[in-house]
């Protein structure tokens, strides 16, 4: 390994601790923080705690061209394919069979456990098949294929629920099939079950480039956002609510401020325009000044609940408000369709299970003379590339980006120069350059010391890398390998 004179140690040393020491001086922290991870009294570690305030994220382009466009409702497609796994946790269990008639809101999948979610038909029609399918991320699940009748008849069972206390609210949330629709897909009733919450955080940051679905939700459905917040605060006995909105949405900030002005315990907090402002731990710190510990009381990774907070996406809480009013569960999704290859960029509301290709067609198709180079589901920072347009829109999908072949060309990576920019960009205060090195040598102990399990896969490190290396992808692989080794029980 190459060496150099390190003024922080007063001797020749390898570049590895020297880079760590340089960053320690630059951020105002001691070098030792970067060379060990010592548990602290709060259940976290010195690495996470010391770096928390130096975490900065990345200044990514906003590209919110569709923010001013009203949502368009898509015509009912001829077919939908609805997977039983559209959430974190156990897949739902199909409760329909081939030939069954379904309506909008008919249950087709029952939650497979506490950490799971019910799934409902988004269309009226006939079940064509219940069969295995490969998801866009490569995993396998069971899916229900439905041929639509074009009527969109609503199931008579869809009636507004009666909510009088927390248990009945939890039942309503479960019956809604509600999950985090901002991207994670975590079942909402699991979050709200905690009894140690004093602050409800509404995540309206929408910090990903291109995506404007939450912006349109705030401008078009502010009444159901407020009713959803009121229900959660009342029945979960949460005294305080903060709605966090990035400052690049002034209309949304003004509108929500006017609506909550006379609501007790509710405030709107403008957030810095810095990606990833919507990340859970970043949002908790920015809005409340609290820390989410690395390790919670149970010994598992810390959650916002360990800091007295529960986070709901703004569209999720609005969906709850709509369900309490109408009894219609989560069956449709607003999607931002953008990119230089799509003919008519817009926000479009589609039935869950609609194939990407049908969404693309509803937005005018691919521009004439443009060769499609890449389809991204989600945003450009945390989304994934789809191998084709033959995949369905899920509950948590909020973007479909279409880029030309020219725009989709990846830059040629060069050798890492250990500049430390990935360290500066990481919102979790990690050292991606060291994690990558440890992963390449399959060094479990170093990955543990470098807290690889804190990585949120935000992509800031890759964005900041001047060598154009796939740092975030390697971080994700490193985290998966580390957690896999941890599950083996031998470490």
Residue map of PLM features:
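Cysteine-centered iron-sulfur cluster-binding motifs in ferredoxin-type domains/subunits
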Residues: 3-24, 33, 94-100, 410-430, ...
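N-terminal, Lys/Arg-enriched amphipathic/low-complexity engagement segments
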Residues: 43-95, 145
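Short, well-structured beta-strand-loop connectors
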Residues: 97-110, 129, 424
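Conserved hydrophobic positions within beta-strands
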Residues: 125-127
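Acidic low-complexity segments
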Residues: 129, 134-195, 250
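Gly-rich Lys/Arg/Thr-decorated short loops/hinges at beta-loop-alpha junctions or inter-strand turns
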Residues: 180, 200-214, 341
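Hydrophobic alpha-helical positions that pack around
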Residues: 239-356, 363-369
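Ferredoxin-type iron-sulfur electron-transfer modules in oxidoreductases and energy-metabolism complexes
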Residues: 397-413, 423, 427-463, 467-491
């Amino acid at each position: 390994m190459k060496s150099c004179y390190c003024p922080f140690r007063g001797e020749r040393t390898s570049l590895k601790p020297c880079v760590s020491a340089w960053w320690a001086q630059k951020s105002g922290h001691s070098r030792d923080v970067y060379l060990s991870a010592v548990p602290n009294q709060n259940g976290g570690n010195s690495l996470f705690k010391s770096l928390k305030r130096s975490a900065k994220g990345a200044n990514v382009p906003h590209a919110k061209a569709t923010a001013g466009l009203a949502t368009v409702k898509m015509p009912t497609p001829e077919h939908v394919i609805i997977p039983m796994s559209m959430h974190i946790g156990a897949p739902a269990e199909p409760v329909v069979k081939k030939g069954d008639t379904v309506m909008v809101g008919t249950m087709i999948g029952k939650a497979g456990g506490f950490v799971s979610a019910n799934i409902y038909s988004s269309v009226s029609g006939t079940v064509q098949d219940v069969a295995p399918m490969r998801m866009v991320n490569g995993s396998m699940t069971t899916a229900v294929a439905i041929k639509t009748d074009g009527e969109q008849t609503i199931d008579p069972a869809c009636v507004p629920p009666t909510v009088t206390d927390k248990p009945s609210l939890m039942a309503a949330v479960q019956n809604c099939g509600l999950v985090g629709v901002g991207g994670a897909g975590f079942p909402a009733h699991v979050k709200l079950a905690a009894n140690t919450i004093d602050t409800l955080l509404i995540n309206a940051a929408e910090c990903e480039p291109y995506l404007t679905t939450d912006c349109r939700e705030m401008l078009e459905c502010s009444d159901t956002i407020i009713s959803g917040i009121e229900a959660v605060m009342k029945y979960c006995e949460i005294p305080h609510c903060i709605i966090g909105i990035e400052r690049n949405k002034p209309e949304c900030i003004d509108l929500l401020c006017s609506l909550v002005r006379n609501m007790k315990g509710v405030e709107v907090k403008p957030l810095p325009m810095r990606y990833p402002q919507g990340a859970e731990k970043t949002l908790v710190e920015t809005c409340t000044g609290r820390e989410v510990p690395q390790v919670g009381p149970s010994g598992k990774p810390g959650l916002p609940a360990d800091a007295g907070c529960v986070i709901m996406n703004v569209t999720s809480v609005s969906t709850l408000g709509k369900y309490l009013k109408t009894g219609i569960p989560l069956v449709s999704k607003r999607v931002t369709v953008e990119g230089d290859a799509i003919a008519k960029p817009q926000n479009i509301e589609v039935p869950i299970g609609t194939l990407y290709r049908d969404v693309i067609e509803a937005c005018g198709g691919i521009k004439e003379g443009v060769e499609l180079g890449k389809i991204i589901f989600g945003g450009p920072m945390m989304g994934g590339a789809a191998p084709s347009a033959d995949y369905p829109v899920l509950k948590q999908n909020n973007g479909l980006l279409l880029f030309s072949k020219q725009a989709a060309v990846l830059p040629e990576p060069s050798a890492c120069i250990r500049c430390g920019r990935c360290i500066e960009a990481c919102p979790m205060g990690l050292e991606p350059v060291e994690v990558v090195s440890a992963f390449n040598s399959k060094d479990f102990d170093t990955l543990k010391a470098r807290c690889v399990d804190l990585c949120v896969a935000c992509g800031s490190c890759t964005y900041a890398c001047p060598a154009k290396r796939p740092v975030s992808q390697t971080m994700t692989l490193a985290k998966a390998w580390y957690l896999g080794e941890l599950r083996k029980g031998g470490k």
